[in-house]
């Protein structure tokens, strides 16, 4: 939509910041080609649920553009273990061996973080670089859809206006 393209043009401004960080030899997660994975895997039309987190995991190999998700063969982080425990306790869903939530994304769950990037080993480091404008616009546009479900995990996520 036109509103999202306006927000997308703002993303260009983030690129300059990220290039600068990389030129200073800082490691940024997720890798560049994976920053927008949540949108590549879950289209606007297919989105039924938004799970909103704070920022990507900041450890090596963890973040891949889906909030709370890690790739196969990566240790499941404590936050995701807690989510799995709650799903098991409340809904009797078996706790998986992998923390890869790609299957959720393909089923219409938009796994979005308030900030789409983070510096290695520095949680919440990109909170103030402007990602909020973009993610606020995404949430605003999705708000036009009927019967959307929002799950807000983390303090920053809970501050979002729905």
Tell me the role of every PLM-derived stretch.
Residues 1-8, 12:
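Single conserved hydrophobic/aromatic residue that forms the stacking wall/gate
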């Amino acid at each position: 939509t036109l509103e999202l393209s306006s927000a997308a043009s703002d993303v260009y401004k983030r690129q300059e910041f990220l290039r600068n960080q990389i030129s200073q030899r800082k490691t940024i997660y997720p890798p560049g080609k994976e920053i927008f994975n949540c949108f590549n895997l879950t289209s606007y039309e297919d989105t039924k649920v938004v799970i909103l987190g704070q920022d990507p995991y900041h450890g090596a190999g963890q973040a891949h553009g889906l909030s709370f998700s890690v790739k196969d063969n990566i240790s499941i982080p404590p936050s995701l273990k807690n989510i799995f425990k709650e799903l098991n306790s409340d809904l009797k869903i078996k706790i998986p061996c992998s923390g890869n939530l790609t299957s959720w994304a393909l089923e219409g769950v938009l796994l979005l973080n308030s900030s789409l990037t983070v510096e290695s080993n520095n949680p919440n480091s990109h909170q103030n670089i402007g990602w909020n404008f973009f993610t606020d616009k995404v949430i605003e546009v999705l708000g036009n859809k009927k019967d959307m479900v929002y799950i807000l995990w983390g303090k920053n996520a809970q501050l979002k206006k729905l």
